[in-house]
């Protein structure tokens, strides 16, 4: 049995109208759905125009991507631990990419970007305003979201954005018509979604809380029991996934890395200042550069949803933000980092698009052309405003791939290869020989090693003592070779700290070293000859 959650907004047709006398034939009733599907697919495919796909498929992985990419070269049993807190199911998807060059793994986040854009269109469809116009506006909001346009890297953040939009769709559908299976769908996406994202539960809890608020506002008290049961199931499944898969991979090193993004708890004034500063810093990636414009756009969207009697949708983003802030204060999730904020930043332009569509719908009572004109005017502002992010190249320029290619084509018998700590993860992905990943002091609890290759020296850390010991070991390997067959020492480096650079300069000062420029970090060829 189903019950309507809200009275229809003025533009909605009464359910079952198609069965009344004079209704259109069944075949013609399918055309709007077919058009919706085609438009959703078109918006999704438009992602290929606003992202530089050739750049994504040829730009070398940098260190933060490389240790995720290494999961496809490791035994399948190491996939979860190597990926650290990267969602395990998302990480397994990397093994399924069937075509492309070495950087083909970025097709996974690209696919989720396309799904998010298509879902953006479908969200507009569920609002029951001006069907195609609203969908195009909300689809364009996701498609040209600066936060998503910046995300070409090998991370799960686009999947998190997709999950957020999907949860908004599910809440809208539940507002359209209350059905238990729709409520269960929200609980399932929010909990099982943790296998693909780290943030679905934040938005899911916000969705359930928002629906509870709507039930109170509309005095639908009996539905609160359904919400409580679905929420309990959602939290139980989420807790099980968190305890077994996520929490064990959270380390003190990771917590320390995100320390600047945790809300201070010692003073209310400091906390408020921190939150404002972080939000202001993210404003350019929310929609428009001035923070005030973004804030007014969000408030307009919330007001429009309240006018449409969609209290749950109106409350979702504010409650999501509140949850993230609380999680940050508890040192469980960073607040204010662009990458980890993508999942909620993408909702900001969506709310703006809803405000525009609602305004056009209201104006349509005066002039039927108003929704189209208002929508066109909004796109005329939105497209140029986000153009600076279109086809942007924001992946850090660390080209271990070129270094490995040069090394592989010039390596000779007797040579020794010395790989720096930070370069080792990309090296492990690109170098043809199969690496091993023993437990160590790496960002994911593993380091790179080549126990079957005696000519390989991989530094386990980046302290000066590690560089000194590694270079000494490489020299010993050269000295141990017969005088007539001694090779050279290849030094592969990337993502260096200032201390590393100074240490290398000191260690190699006055030594016979050739600098071979094949990328941002040149290959060093050390012609060491023992005395």
What is each of the regions a protein language model found here?
Residues 2-32:
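Short, Lys/Arg-rich, polar N-terminal cytosolic tail immediately upstream
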């Amino acid at each position: 049995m189903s019950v309507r959650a809200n009275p229809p907004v003025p533009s909605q047709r009464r359910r079952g109208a198609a069965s009344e006398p004079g209704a259109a034939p069944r075949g013609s009733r399918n055309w709007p759905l077919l058009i919706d599907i085609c438009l959703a697919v078109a918006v999704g495919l438009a992602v290929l125009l606003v992202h530089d796909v050739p750049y994504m498929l040829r730009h070398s992985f940098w260190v933060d991507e490389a240790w995720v990419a290494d999961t496809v070269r490791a035994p399948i049993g190491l996939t979860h631990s190597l990926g650290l807190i990267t969602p395990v199911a998302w990480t397994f998807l990397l093994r399924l990419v069937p075509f492309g060059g070495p950087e083909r793994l970025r097709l996974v986040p690209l696919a989720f970007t396309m799904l998010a854009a298509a879902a953006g269109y479908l969200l507009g469809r569920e609002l029951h305003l001006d069907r195609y116009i609203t969908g195009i506006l909300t689809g364009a909001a996701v498609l040209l979201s600066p936060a998503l346009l910046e995300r070409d890297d090998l991370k799960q953040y686009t999947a998190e954005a997709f999950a957020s939009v999907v949860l908004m769709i599910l809440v809208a559908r539940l507002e359209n018509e209350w059905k238990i299976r729709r409520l269960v769908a929200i609980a399932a996406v929010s909990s099982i979604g943790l296998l693909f994202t780290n943030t679905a539960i934040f938005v899911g809890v916000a969705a359930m809380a928002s629906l509870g608020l709507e039930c109170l506002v509309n005095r639908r008290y009996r539905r609160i029991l359904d919400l409580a049961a679905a929420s309990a199931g959602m939290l139980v499944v989420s807790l099980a996934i968190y305890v077994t898969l996520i929490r064990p991979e959270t380390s003190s090193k990771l917590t320390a890395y995100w320390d600047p993004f945790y809300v201070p708890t010692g003073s209310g004034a400091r906390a408020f200042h921190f939150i404002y500063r972080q939000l202001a810093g993210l404003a350019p990636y929310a929609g428009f550069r001035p923070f005030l414009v973004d804030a007014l756009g969000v408030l307009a969207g919330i007001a429009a949803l309240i006018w449409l009697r969609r209290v749950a949708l109106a409350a979702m983003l504010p409650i999501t933000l509140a949850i993230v802030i609380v999680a940050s204060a508890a040192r469980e999730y960073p607040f204010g980092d662009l990458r980890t904020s993508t999942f909620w930043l993408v909702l900001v332009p969506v709310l703006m698009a809803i405000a525009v569509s609602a305004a056009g719908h209201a104006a349509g009572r005066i002039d039927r052309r108003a929704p189209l004109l208002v929508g066109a005017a909004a796109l005329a502002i939105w497209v140029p405003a986000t153009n600076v992010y279109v086809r942007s190249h924001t992946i850090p320029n660390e080209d271990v791939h070129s270094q490995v290619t040069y090394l592989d084509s010039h390596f000779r018998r007797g040579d020794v290869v010395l790989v720096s700590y930070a370069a080792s993860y990309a090296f492990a992905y690109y170098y043809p020989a199969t690496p091993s990943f023993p437990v160590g002091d790496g960002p994911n609890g593993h380091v790179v090693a080549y126990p079957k290759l005696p000519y390989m020296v991989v530094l386990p850390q980046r302290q000066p003592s590690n560089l000194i010991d590694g270079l000494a070991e490489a020299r010993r390997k050269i000295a141990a070779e017969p005088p007539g067959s001694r090779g050279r020492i290849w030094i592969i480096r990337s993502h260096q700290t200032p201390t590393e650079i100074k240490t290398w300069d000191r260690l190699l000062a006055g030594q016979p070293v050739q600098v071979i420029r094949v990328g941002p970090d040149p290959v060093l060829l050390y012609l060491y000859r023992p005395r």
